[in-house]
Amino acid sequence: MNNDIMIEFRNLTKKFKDFYAVSNINLEISRGEIVGFLGPNGAGKSTTMKMLAHLLKPTEGEIWIRGNGELQKLSSHNKDYLLNNIGFLIENPAFYGNVTPRLVLKYFASLKGYPRNKINNRIEEIIEFFRMSDWIDKKIKTFSKGMRQKIGIASAIIHDPDIIVLDEPSTGLDPKARIEIRDFILKLKKIGKTIFLSSHLLYEVSEIADRVAIINKGNLIAFDTLDNLEAKAKKSIIHFELFGHPEENIKSMLKNIEEIVYPLTGISRDLNWVNYIEESKIFQIFFNGHSENQLNIFEALLKNGYRIIEFSVPKAGLLENLFLEMVNPEGNLNFNNNNHSNLNNVHKELIVEEVQ
């Protein structure tokens, strides 16, 4: 048996009457890795998380968790013991407004059975880790949503668990707070924690996950490293920004760029498109994903006088393409001009502020 496995789902299924919220999921999470659990709203992510937390019981299948060095099947008899090795943030945290973060952390440390004589020292460690010293003794009612989310994550790890489970930890947060939460998650990985993170934000997952599990309509449709998933995504999107281009000439500029890059994209003309995102001033080119084609496109744009100040293929863009292909019931995407506006709407919905 693999001693590195910390959580394992075996044929995990949850059925509500005739509806399968989760269907026959098999998944292993290894020690010290971040696994991103990705899917659109209603895909089955939260249901899976709640089964892991024993808030819902599986209709079929098993959950195995490592406790005291052994992988053990989760049941009503051992749930308190096994789940004590996991820190959960399943839903947006809600705290009494008139208490302080210090009191909240003391409460959760006691609730989780952390040694009484070590609680104060543990709280000081958490304060330093989350940079909470300026507001640890202030009343929570004055806090932003991002600050409350930090307290929620801090409460989840106050008892120093080996495994941390976070359900949509960045939902509803502003960009600054999302970056802070991302950095805290990476710090937790650095000190050896195993993290299972659900999200519908592709950009969030692509930045931090070692492996990505993609779920749709209750079915696990992919589980692999980001690099391997990207290799399977045959198409990619180049993002680039130009220096000082006139806004009024965008339409003619897009047409000209498309004529320049069409022979170099590695895909047929009817699939070619070039896009411009006005809010972020970012141009997009759809191509086959090969490094050589990417270089040829870059050189051709420079040769034709385009002054490029940024040029990249964001990981989130690659993951987005694969995700869209997998959840599309037809098994393919139409990237022709007739469907271009539809693609942009999906793009904006799935990757919020990717290029901010």
Where are these regions (language model features)?
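ABC transporter nucleotide-binding domain
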Residues: R182-Q284, N288
